[in-house]
Amino acid sequence: MTTSGQPTDRQHLHDELERVRADLRDLVAHAGPADLRRRTDGTRWTNGQLLWHMAFGFLIVRRLLPLVRLFGRLPDRFGRRFAAVLEAATRPFHTVNYLGSVGGALVFHGPRLPAQLDRTIAQLHRRLDAEPEATLGRRMHFPVGWDPFFHDTMTLAEVYAYGIAHYDFHRTQLTLEQS
């Protein structure tokens, strides 16, 4: 259930995941070497590094799902403490987040990048289809200092949508010729 008590619109999430998959594939296919080396608007990354970071957001979603399932079953205080511990590590997290995208772009570029996203989104589709509706309403606390799209608490359904919002936000920062 969504926070409004309505069933989760799974088809909308599926459609949005497919939109992202097609968009990244198109961006990578049309970006030349000079495009990928160009700085982005509002980040310290190049376009190539930001493209990896955008795809990596969906890998993060895959790792967050079991955490939300687990903490969604535990008393609220456990999730609140876990989020507080993560929040205390916000500064090192931002450094690792930045450097991880610098390094990730060295490995995942060209056709490897959309192939990785294809595999990840296919896994997210399968998981979303398998989630019982009650599980989609489970929630946990998040370290809000880590990402502007993290909220104090998020449901499993909101975590699926997080990757899409993260992607769309960063897409506006690309400085590719056709973006």
How would you describe each model-predicted region?
Residues M1-E18:
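Extreme N-terminal tail/first-helix region
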Residues T2-T3, R126, A130:
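Charge-dense, helix-prone N-terminal extensions
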Residues E16, A105-L117:
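A short, structured beta-strand-centered segment in the mid-to-C-terminal lobe
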Residues L17, R21-L24, L117, I121-L124, ...:
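Hydrophobic alpha-helical core bundles mediating ligand binding, dimerization, or RNAP-core interactions
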Residues V20-L36, R171:
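Short, Lys/Arg-rich amphipathic segments at extreme N-termini
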Residues R38-T90, A122, D129-A130, A134-S179:
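Short, contiguous alpha-helical
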Residues T90-V96:
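Histidine-centered catalytic/metal-coordination loop motif
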